[in-house]
UniProtKB/Swiss-Prot annotation:
It comes from Hordeum vulgare. Gene3D superfamilies: 3.30.70.100, subunit c (vma5p) of the yeast v-atpase, domain 2 (1.20.1460.10), Vacuolar atp synthase subunit c, domain 1 (3.30.70.1180). Pfam families: V-ATPase_C. This is V-type proton ATPase subunit C. One of its GO terms (cellular component) is vacuolar proton-transporting V-type ATPase, V1 domain. Disulfide bonds: none annotated. Subunit of the peripheral V1 complex of vacuolar ATPase. Subunit C is necessary for the assembly of the catalytic sector of the enzyme and is likely to have a specific function in its catalytic activity. V-ATPase is responsible for acidifying a variety of intracellular compartments in eukaryotic cells. It comes from the Eukaryota.
Length: 354
């Protein structure tokens, strides 16, 4: 269920700022409830930030549009990465929380963090700090995801070698020591025979060269396309045998049996599987979730707070305003309610819609 938020700043005309804010808040609540009774209204408190000059505010207004687009893009990208990781682990995407509370609660109870963003700092510096932090988070996530992608790629390559056809797959896990004969003069070759040419292979392999050991061929494995056969012959005629086998439509796979190499490949696979699981459940997934929380809080809260402050000054001047946050859930059946809400906000000089 998607939730849409409107952030609006309205001018306070009363000389008594406190009384004016209270009266404006009451009138706004009455208007919203009259036009859209199912839309709750929350205060969105923005501190008295340092506005700077008119020229700086105009420039900052343009920068904030670009900044919000950038931060929003990073937030969505990281969120998609989290969902992909969760699906890869066989779990349903979880609910995003900020500082341990749901997103809705975080926004409707937003409090400006003066320790992170001092209110007396120039707004340009505050915006630059927000964007810099988001850019750093994005760079960190790129490195993490690249590492995870590299492990996935290696596992994919190994999996293709183990599950592909006999013409291309790794044969090491199909061969036993007793299947291979290796001596000073004799060698065992592995022949990939088309599934429907096995009779032809058995009838002809001994005649492909005069130095083939009779009745030495044995079938080790068969898939949907090919069968894997061994054949033992004298080492000096290997090249000649390969040529004749190829002419008959049989593929001789280059293979050297090595228990050490086989064990090494097994350990490599186990390590990659372990690395993938650790990355998915720890540094990548948790890092992505933490990154999303940080980006979300920067984009949907602080960046939006700065933007509504800047736009309110540009539109209403330095007069005091009371920012409010109006969430509206978007459903087709609530389109009429949405229109009523928009009409009510326009009546109260809606400033900003996000």
């Amino acid at each position: 269920m998607a939730t849409r938020y409107w952030i609006a700043a309205l001018p306070v005309a009363d000389d008594n700022v406190a009384a004016g804010k209270t009266a404006l808040w009451a009138r706004l609540q009455e208007a919203i409830s009259r036009h859209s009774f199912d839309t709750p209204l929350y205060r969105f408190t923005v501190p008295d930030l340092r506005p700077g000059t008119l020229d700086s505010l105009l420039a900052l207004s343009d920068d904030l549009v670009k900044s919000n687009i950038f931060i929003e893009g990073v937030s969505h990208k990281i969120r998609r990465q989290i969902e992909d990781l969760e699906r890869a682990g066989g779990v349903e995407p979880g609910t995003l929380t900020v500082d341990g509370v749901p997103v809705d609660s975080y926004l409707t109870r937003f409090v400006w963090d003066e320790g992170k963003y001092p209110v007396n700092a120039p707004l340009k510096e505050t915006v630059a700090s927000i964007q810099s932090q988001v850019a750093k988070i994005e760079d960190d996530m790129k490195v993490r995801v690249a590492e995870y992608g590299n492990v996935k790629s290696q596992l994919g390559a190994i999996n293709r070698k183990q599950t592909g056809s006999l013409a291309v797959r790794d044969l090491s896990n199909l061969i036993k020591p007793e299947d291979m004969v290796t001596s000073e003069h004799l060698v065992t070759l592995l022949s990939i025979v088309p599934k429907y040419s096995q009779k032809d292979w058995l009838a002809s392999y001994e005649s492909l060269d005069t130095f083939v050991v009779p009745r030495s061929s044995k079938k080790l494995y068969e898939d949907n396309e090919y069968a894997l056969y061994t054949v033992t012959l004298f080492a000096k005629v290997v090249d000649n045998f390969k040529v004749h086998a190829r002419e008959k439509g049989f593929q001789i796979r280059d293979f050297e049996y090595s228990p050490e190499a086989q064990e090494s490949r097994k350990q490599e696979l186990e390590k990659l599987l372990q690395d993938q699981e650790v990355m998915r459940t720890s540094p990548i997934a948790m890092g992505a979730m933490l990154a999303t929380v940080r980006v979300f809080s920067s984009w949907d809260a602080f960046s939006s707070a700065v933007r509504v402050f800047v736009e309110s000054i540009l539109r209403y001047g330095s007069a005091c305003t009371v920012p409010v946050c109006c969430p509206s859930t978007i459903y087709k059946e609530r389109e009429k309610s949405k229109e009523h809400l928009g009409r009510a906000m326009r009546q109260y000089q809606q400033l900003l819609e996000i």
